[in-house]
UniProtKB/Swiss-Prot annotation:
It is a multi-pass membrane protein. It comes from Acinetobacter baylyi (strain ATCC 33305 / BD413 / ADP1). Pathway: Protein modification; lipoprotein biosynthesis (diacylglyceryl transfer). Coiled coil: none annotated. It holds the Pfam family LGT. One of its GO terms (molecular function) is phosphatidylglycerol-prolipoprotein diacylglyceryl transferase activity. It comes from the Bacteria. PROSITE patterns: LGT (PS01311). The gene is lgt. GO terms for biological process: lipoprotein biosynthetic process. This is Phosphatidylglycerol--prolipoprotein diacylglyceryl transferase. PANTHER family: PHOSPHATIDYLGLYCEROL--PROLIPOPROTEIN DIACYLGLYCERYL TRANSFERASE, PROLIPOPROTEIN DIACYLGLYCERYL TRANSFERASE. It is an enzyme of class 2 (transferase).
Length: 273
């Protein structure tokens, strides 16, 4: 069994201002996405640094607003009805990936109108930059000792740990780290490699949907369901798995359609001498 590091969730205290690790993880996520997108833009003639900066800004708004609204609608709607002001109390925690995903999709529509880019060209461009943000977000969950895993059944399992926020003090899976690795690091490597060569329009976006869908669906088997949600379907499916299934199915259809049409948005990468 591992010992939980029990890191103080407050990273910095500047007088009355307290900076939490979770907020810093979001900042790192956006900075990393901006850096990766800037690198990709230098390899394509039709992208500029201004476009990238705006794209990351629009995406950040979509993530924060969509993530919060999605969490309220998907997981805590009763609390919202009892106290609508709670929606704006973001410091209390509560963000949804699926809500953030929808928020980003809507934000990209506005960005595309501004720069006259097609929606899927834009999504294909930015998709490989997203998993690192997911990784930082899950690390933030781990530091905050939230969204931990289910109880470890094998007494010899070496990676279980007791989270200080667990009222039952059970040895649990560090599912936040599993998600950081699968939804973050591994998905980033896959998408970065796949997008390093010209692919049909929608193919990169499709691979993101499928890759995230598979990773999230599998890791949910190790993650403790929300106490007020439990298992929603068939006695074993969680809300996260249910919301992920449409992403996986849409991704499968998209990659099939992409290779049927074979429309390309860019040619070989630029070389710099």
């Amino acid at each position: 069994m591992l010992t939980y590091p029990n890191i103080d969730p407050v990273a910095l205290s500047l007088g009355p201002l307290k900076v939490h690790w979770y907020g810093l993880m979001y900042l790192l996520a956006f900075l990393c996405a901006w850096g990766l997108a800037s690198y990709r833009a230098k390899q394509r003639d039709s992208w500029t640094s201004e476009m990238v900066s705006d794209l990351v800004f629009y995406g950040a708004l979509g993530v924060v607003l969509g993530g919060r609204v999605g969490y309220v609608l998907f997981y805590e709607f009763d609390k919202f009805l009892a106290n609508p002001i709670w929606l704006f109390q973001v410091w209390t925690g509560g963000m949804s990936f699926h809500g953030g995903f929808i928020g980003v999709m809507l934000a990209m529509i506005l960005w595309c109108r501004k720069y006259q880019k097609t929606w899927f060209e834009t999504l294909d461009f930015i998709a490989p930059c997203v998993p690192t943000g997911l990784m930082f977000g899950r690390i933030g969950n781990f530091i905050g000792a939230e969204l931990y895993g289910r109880e470890v059944q094998d007494p010899n399992y070496p990676f279980g740990m007791i989270f200080p926020t667990d009222p039952f003090h059970l040895v649990r899976h560090p599912s936040q780290i599993y998600q950081a690795i699968c939804e973050g690091l591994l998905l980033f490597i896959l998408l970065w490699w796949f997008s390093s060569k010209p692919r049909p329009r929608m193919a990169v976006s499709a691979l993101f949907l499928m890759g995230y869908g598979v990773a999230r669906f599998v890791v949910e088997f190790f993650r403790e369901p929300d106490a007020d949600q439990g298992f929603i379907l068939f006695g074993w499916m969680t809300k996260g798995q249910i919301l992920t299934v449409p992403m996986l199915l849409i991704g499968l259809w998209m990659i099939w359609y992409a290779y049927q049409r074979k429309v390309y948005d860019w040619g070989p990468l630029k070389t710099h001498k």
